[in-house]
UniProtKB/Swiss-Prot annotation:
GO BP terms in the entry: cell division; cell wall organization; peptidoglycan biosynthetic process; regulation of cell shape
NCBIfam families: murC
Statement: the UniProt record of this protein carries the keyword Cell wall biogenesis/degradation: yes
Record's protein name: UDP-N-acetylmuramate--L-alanine ligase
Domain of life: Bacteria
Gene3D superfamilies tied to this protein: Mur ligase, C-terminal domain (3.90.190.20), Mur-like, catalytic domain (3.40.1190.10), NAD(P)-binding Rossmann-like Domain (3.40.50.720)
Residues that coordinate or bind ATP: 112-118
Catalytic activities: UDP-N-acetyl-alpha-D-muramate + L-alanine + ATP = UDP-N-acetyl-alpha-D-muramoyl-L-alanine + ADP + phosphate + H(+)
GO function term, MF aspect, one: ATP binding
Length: 483
């Protein structure tokens, strides 16, 4: 491919899925250009690595490109897409470009409605500790690597497989993981859950005869498709019939401790005593997927144990910002940020927080993501949002969707008040959320910002605002001059 295609342009290069692929292509020696509406940490990193990143979208940005990569978030009337069509420059969906990268190595694809990013990160970390030096493309920043992508020298590439637009059906990996199957992105599947499950079955059919499907049998929908998977299967979870099974799991000081029983290839492997540097039973399941793959690839047990104990997490996945002073300066609260935006994953994260911080007041600042999801999961949102001790509710982050009547932040607020479980505070402008958090937070609270939209910028703004207050106080204490 390289002798024909040398210059690759990304429309929306700062996106989580796009930036990782762009970084790997840069490291492979391609010339990469891209455009995005604004600057971000991802675009700054790509620029430092040698990419040319332009702000805004304009037809001239595609001049000289041999291929133009787009995600499903890019509309067909985008001026760069229109210019590429006019010039007969191939327009390549993001998933197709990822599939091309997988052709260069042996692919490990992580699919599922929830937990893809964390599971992908755990798999990459365990394989790296085992000396396999994988390439990875992740939808979040792997803290230990300081990036969401890396070109390794080993045989494997580990990547997320996105079911939201059915693009995971473009991939042909040798190992697949399905963490769970839930009702999300239902517009893609005509609001037919059977079609969504069928897509996951078809995903397993992409495996070669020597491939492996690693399936979480704790999930009832994954268990339901099990009879239709024709390739070799490794079952993992807490269930008694799991081949890679966790027992005696418990939360200890914000981590999870558990024992892993493995029955693979007709014989029992030695039990593993695991300390996972993440909270929550859902993360135990995610770790089991990584353990199953690592065991199949003969990663030494000591490397598995070490990687999970030292795992430093992923950006915006239960990311701890530390202890922040309260507005009155008389106390401190724990600030955590999480990408969760579906009721199921939100419930898992909140349960993990309760386990990690027992007895403490839990304050949630939540920004719903997409009007369609808010509409489709409205009652489930009401249930999960009613489980916290205090709630700050932002307006829906549209992600390009038009508003839907009775599926916005105000509608959720009204429904929560009618339910009577909690008295939410509606924060109409996300710019006001940092101050709303400081007004609400009390000493010893655990405050979680949650959502897939612009709320991800809020924790840093809270920390920065309190740092400015402390700096001003230092000036006052020193008679008007900073020490």
């Amino acid at each position: 491919m390289k002798h024909i295609v040398k210059n690759i342009h990304f429309v929306g290069i700062g996106g989580a899925g796009m930036s990782g692929i762009a970084e790997v292509l840069l490291n492979l020696g391609y010339r990469v250009t891209g455009s995005d509406l604004g600057q971000s940490a991802a675009t700054q990193r790509l620029t430092a690595l040698g990419a040319t990143v332009m702000q805004g979208h304009a037809p001239e940005h595609v001049v000289g490109a041999n291929a133009v990569v787009v995600s499903t978030a890019v509309r067909g009337d985008n001026p760069e897409v229109l210019a590429a069509r006019a010039k007969r420059i191939p327009i390549v969906p993001r998933a197709v470009m990822l599939a091309e990268l997988m052709r260069l190595k042996q692919g490990i694809a992580i699919a599922g409605t929830h937990g893809k990013t964390t599971t992908t990160s755990l798999v990459a970390s365990v394989l790296a500790e085992g000396g396999l030096d994988p390439t990875f493309v992740i939808g979040g920043r792997l803290n230990s690597a300081g990036a969401n992508a890396r070109l390794g020298t080993g045989d494997f590439i580990v990547a997320e497989a996105d079911e939201s637009d059915a693009s995971f059906l473009n991939l042909f990996p040798v190992i697949e993981v399905i963490t769970n199957i839930d009702a999300d992105h239902m517009d893609t599947y005509g609001h037919d859950f059977a079609r969504l499950k069928q897509a996951f079955i078809e995903f397993t059919h992409r495996l070669p005869f020597y491939g492996i499907a690693v399936l979480c049998v704790d999930d009832p929908n994954v268990r339901e498709i099990l009879p239709f998977v024709s390739k070799p299967v490794v079952r993992y979870g807490f269930a008694e019939d799991a081949q890679v099974r966790a027992v005696n799991a418990r939360a200890v000081d914000g981590r999870m401790e558990f024992t892993v029983i493995r029955q693979l290839n007709g014989h029992a492997e030695p039990p593993l005593s695991i300390t996972l540097n993440l909270p929550g039973m859902h993360n135990v399941q995610n770790a089991l997927a990584a353990i199953a793959i690592a065991t199949e690839l003969e990663v030494p047990d000591e490397a598995i144990v070490k990687a999970l104990a030292e795992f430093n997490g992923v950006g915006r996945r239960f990311q701890r910002y530390g202890e922040v002073p309260t507005a009155d300066g008389q106390g401190r609260f724990t600030l955590i940020d999480d990408y969760g935006h579906h009721p199921v994953e939100m419930a898992a994260t909140l349960a993990a927080a309760r386990g990690a911080f027992p007895g403490r007041r839990l304050v949630l600042a939540f920004q719903p993501h997409r009007f369609t999801r808010t509409r489709d999961c409205f009652e489930d949102f009401i249930k999960v949002l009613g489980t916290v001790d205090a709630l700050l509710l932002a307006e829906v982050y549209a992600a390009g969707e038009p508003p839907i009547v009775a599926a916005d932040g105000r509608a959720l607020t009204r429904a929560l008040r009618v339910a009577g479980k909690i008295e939410p505070v509606f924060v109409e402008q996300i710019e006001d959320m940092p101050q709303a958090i400081l007004d609400a937070a009390q000493d010893n609270d655990v405050v979680i910002t949650m959502g897939a939209g612009s709320i991800g910028q809020v924790p840093g703004q809270v920390v920065a605002r309190q740092a400015e207050v402390r700096a001003a106080n230092v000036v006052d204490l020193n008679g008007g001059a900073a020490a």
